[in-house]
Swiss-Prot record:
Ranges annotated as biased composition (Basic and acidic residues): 75-124
Gene designation per UniProt: CSP
Family (UniProt): Belongs to the plasmodium circumsporozoite protein family.
UniProt region (15 X 6 AA tandem repeats of Q-G-P-G-A-P), positions on chain: 139-228
Pro residues composition bias: residue spans: 228-262
Protein name as it appears in the record: Circumsporozoite protein
Disulfide bonds: C306-C339, C310-C344
Functional note: Essential sporozoite protein. In the mosquito vector, required for sporozoite development in the oocyst, migration through the vector hemolymph and entry into the vector salivary glands. In the vertebrate host, required for sporozoite migration through the host dermis and infection of host hepatocytes. Binds to highly sulfated heparan sulfate proteoglycans (HSPGs) on the surface of host hepatocytes.
Length: 367
């Protein structure tokens, strides 16, 4: 049994080492081949169209050959059919031939006059054609009657209705605000009550209702104590309603709405940038220079091997017209490029093979 196990292990190791297309390596190489091949839809479509065109040409050639073969086979049959036609001509009686040749043919000669009649027919046709063309031409110019329809655009008289917007004469009613002559009593603003009235001008925030600004006339009225009956009706209703409603509504709404969306957007952008930075690999200058020192003897103007056997790394080459020693090279004298080694299966194969050899040696020497 021991010998059998030794032989089996040895055979497996030999197969793995000598035949890389066997076992695990086979699947790995198949994946690599599939990844190396570029299946572009454009190329596939081109190949498909090329094959179809070739098949179409072959099919057309076959059809042509068949038709030619049928034609060649049909010609002798027609020749065979031709002599019976001659026989039919022979079967005709001589009397008929004589009847055909004499007076009838001579009578047919004068019908050359109908040939003369033929050209006039062509002339009639020629005359008819231009007449038809004239009729069509007449019908075409008749179409300009359609442009006569611009009378419809005459309807813009309807826009003449903007005379209705002339109704803004009604807003001319602001002549009532001309009543500020009453506030002309500012002689009394010496009273502190007058400065309180500037709250009323704050009301212009609602210019949508110009009637409101007319209200400041009311506060001016308290200065005219001569008419105490009118002010108590207007000011208590309008001024208390407008100033408390407008100032508290506007300032609290605007400041909280503007600053809040901004930090949110910035946070999202920061998160996205963080994710992108995590995905991308950017080597440092020290790593690049260390790799250059390692490959100083092999560094040329062609790309070097990747600095990593598995994962993402860097490959390097000299720039043209650079004659410095590798020790004195800087990042300005070197072209760098990021390389990725996604397939690390070879490492696992090496490990498995090494373990197999160790097991083989143990079985051979310690048993």
């Amino acid at each position: 049994m021991k010998k059998c196990t030794i032989l089996v292990v040895a055979s497996l190791l030999l197969v793995d080492s000598l035949l890389p297309g066997y076992g695990q390596n086979k699947s790995v190489q198949a994946q690599r081949n599939l990844n190396e091949l570029c299946y572009n839809e454009e190329n596939d479509n081109k190949l498909y169209h090329v094959l179809n065109s070739k098949n179409g040409k072959i099919y057309n050639r076959n059809i042509v050959n068949r038709l030619l073969g049928d034609a060649l086979n049909g010609k002798p049959e027609e020749k065979k059919d031709d002599p019976p036609k001659d026989g039919n001509k022979d079967d005709l009686p001589k009397e008929e031939k004589k009847d055909d040749l004499p007076k009838e043919e001579k009578k047919d000669d004068p019908p050359k006059d109908p040939k003369k009649d033929d050209p006039p027919k062509e002339a009639q046709n020629k005359l008819n054609q231009p007449v038809v063309a004239d009729e069509n031409v007449d019908q075409g110019p008749g179409a300009p009657q359609g442009p006569g329809a611009p009378q419809g655009p005459g309807a813009p008289q309807g826009p003449g209705a903007p005379q209705g917007p002339g109704a803004p004469q009604g807003p001319g009613a602001p002549q009532g605000p001309g009543a500020p002559q009453g506030p002309g009593a500012p002689q009394g603003p010496g009273a502190p009550q007058g400065p309180g009235a500037p709250q009323g001008p704050g009301a212009p925030q609602g210019p949508g209702a110009p009637q409101g600004p007319g209200a400041p006339q009311g506060p001016g009225a308290p200065q005219g104590p001569g008419a105490p009956q009118e002010p108590p009706q207007q000011p208590p209703q309008q001024p208390p309603q407008q100033p408390p409603q407008q100032p508290p509504q506007q300032p609290p709404q605007q400041p909280p709405q503007q600053p809040r969306p901004q930090p949110d957007g910035n946070n999202n952008n920061n998160n996205n940038n963080g994710n992108n930075n995590e995905d991308s690999y950017v080597p440092s200058a020290e790593q690049i220079l260390e790799f250059v020192k390692q490959i100083s003897s092999q560094l040329t103007e062609e790309w070097s091997q990747c600095s990593v056997t598995c994962g993402s790394g860097v490959r390097v080459r000299k720039r043209k017209n650079v004659n410095k020693q590798p020790e004195n090279l800087t990042l300005e004298d070197i072209d760098t490029e990021i390389c990725k080694m996604d397939k690390c299966s070879s490492i696992f194969n090496i490990v498995s093979n090494s373990l197999g050899f160790v097991i083989l040696l143990v079985l051979v020497f310690f048993n």
